[in-house]
């Protein structure tokens, strides 16, 4: 069995009981480990993650989760970690500590004879999307694109890693907390097949001849299972922050499931 999950936002200051939340995710992974050959973590597993040049005591809060990843990879389960827009800044320590494989960009894979497109989902929009939006929306999208470029800039990443972790983490965790609180105050539900960015992106890929049987994303914190055509399908995984939804794939079927809390 192959599993896909995303958006746990471990360590979020917007979570009332972060240790209990972490334990739920651990229970979820251990349940999957009973029959898993691979687990794909599709981004934003951490609410904020950065590997500095200095020792960072804040990583100790994740020790139970990191130990679980190590135990699973030691058993021969392949665990793939896709960076999201909250946990971009991993530079080798996480992979070395746990045995996972880190992916920094979308991947196109063939699994069980099916062609898959896997990504967190941030920054994926159709080529003409910006021009079609009202000016107010264009402004917000441009701000997001600018911020994403800043976060992915190698020079700025290097400089940020030079900061003392206590100072940098305060900024990072507060920024991430504000993002979560905004989502709670003003949730963004499914926009519809003709407006949802990831749906439009997947449709454009199909139109361009870049066919995939499944497109699997996180990022949006919505649960979606939609047929794009007779032989192409998109799934948005929900999240492991509030919903604890995931997808599982066997030889015959891919479906979204709920973890029983």
Where are these regions (language model features)?
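Residue-level detector of flexible, active-site-proximal loop/helix-junction positions
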Residues: 9, 109, 125, 241, ...
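Core catalytic region of metal-dependent phosphoesterases/phosphodiesterases
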Residues: 5, 10-111
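N-terminal short leaders/motifs
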Residues: 47-73, 171, 180-212
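Arg/Gly-rich low-complexity intrinsically disordered repeat tracts
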Residues: 251-261
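Active-site-proximal loop/helix segment associated with metal-binding centers of metalloenzymes
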Residues: 121-200
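Conserved beta-sheet core of the metallophosphoesterase superfamily
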Residues: 97, 101-104, 117, 122, ...
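Extreme N-terminal starter segment of soluble prokaryotic enzymes
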Residues: 1-3
């Amino acid at each position: 069995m192959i599993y896909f999950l995303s958006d746990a936002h471990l360590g979020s200051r917007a979570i009332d009981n972060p240790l209990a939340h972490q334990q739920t995710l651990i229970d979820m992974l251990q349940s999957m480990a009973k029959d898993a050959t691979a687990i794909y973590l599709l981004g934003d597993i951490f609410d904020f993650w950065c590997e500095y040049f200095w020792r960072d005591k804040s990583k100790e809060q994740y020790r139970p989760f990191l130990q679980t990843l190590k135990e699973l990879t030691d058993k021969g389960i392949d665990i793939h970690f896709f960076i999201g827009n909250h946990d971009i800044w991993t530079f080798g320590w996480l992979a070395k500590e746990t045995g996972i494989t880190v992916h920094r960009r979308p991947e196109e894979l063939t699994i069980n004879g099916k062609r898959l497109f896997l990504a967190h989902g941030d920054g994926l929009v159709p080529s003409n999307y910006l021009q079609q939006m009202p000016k107010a929306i264009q402004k917000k999208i441009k701000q997001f694109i600018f911020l994403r470029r800043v976060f992915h800039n190698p020079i700025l990443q290097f400089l940020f890693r030079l900061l003392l972790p206590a100072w940098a983490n305060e900024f990072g965790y507060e920024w991430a907390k504000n993002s979560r609180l905004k989502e709670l105050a003003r949730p963004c539900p499914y926009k519809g097949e003709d407006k949802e960015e990831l749906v439009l992106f997947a449709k454009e890929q199909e139109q361009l001849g870049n066919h995939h049987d499944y497109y699997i994303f996180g990022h949006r914190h919505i649960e979606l299972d939609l047929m794009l055509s007779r032989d192409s399908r998109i799934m948005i995984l929900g999240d492991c922050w509030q919903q604890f939804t995931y997808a599982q794939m066997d030889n015959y079927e891919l479906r979204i499931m709920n973890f029983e809390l």
